[in-house]
Amino acid sequence: MEFFRIQRDIPFMRFAPVLNVISALLFVAAVFFLFTRGLHLSIEFTGGTVMEVHYPHAADLAAVREVPRRLGYGDVQVQAFGNPRDVVIRLPLHAGESSTMQSGRVMAALQAADPQAKLARTEFVGPQVGSELATDGLKALAFVIGGIMLYLALRFEWKFSVAAIVANLHDVIIVLGFFAFFQWEFSLPVLAAVLAVLGYSVNESVVIFDRVRENFRKYRKYTTVQVIDSAITNTISRTIITHGATLAMAFSMFLFGGPALHYFALALIIGISMSIYSSVFVAAAIAMWLRVKREDLLKSGPGRPKNPNDPNAGAVV
């Protein structure tokens, strides 16, 4: 499906040298902030107190969120749970206070603001459990990256595989770098968004590389740069449709999803935008710098008749 077709190929690779330098600087900056500032982990990773409060009416989340903040709990997560009358409050660990003391103080303040509020459940998430979640999250990220690397190694010639893997890491590190620089809260939903970004990034690179391989067979007189420019130009319409729809969904969650989905949607917006950029100016550019050529993708087909009038005779992918 295409919204439009561009008749003349756009010279994307003409801008690759400058944009590759910018990408390298962004990547180095992201790594620097990850090591110096680190990620601002949520209580799911660091531990804390989880309270479930029931109201006989729809709860005012903004008012509920303000109550623990007035008590000195800065990084509080408040969200509706199941229905508008049930609220989940996540409190970070506080020096000198037990989980029971935390929940007691907050509940007393909530009932002072609304006597009908009732504590339905309280739970303590210890630092050890949070550490296990962080470890499991890193394992999930490593498994996804490993699976993508294996798929690319089997699916493409090694130069394309290296280019796609570098583009994947570029996107993930820069997303994490944004969260480290601005100290946005990194939670389990944000980790899920990072894993989704990995999928979007490799998908876009694979689409372009498939078209590059097809164009090598189709245009024998084209140079490598011309083949790559043509492949990217031919896939622009598809990119606009798929990523435009996904970004529209992510922006909807960002604008209307409330605090619970805020950083999840933000990670998706940054990651998907970076995947569009990196598939063109990182993955395709690296394939160009590695000097991918027709001979890397096409090989002689044994026993096949060769037609001298067929420019692709004897070549198979």
What are these regions, as identified by a protein language model?
Residues 1-317:
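A structural signal for conserved, well-ordered secondary-structure elements
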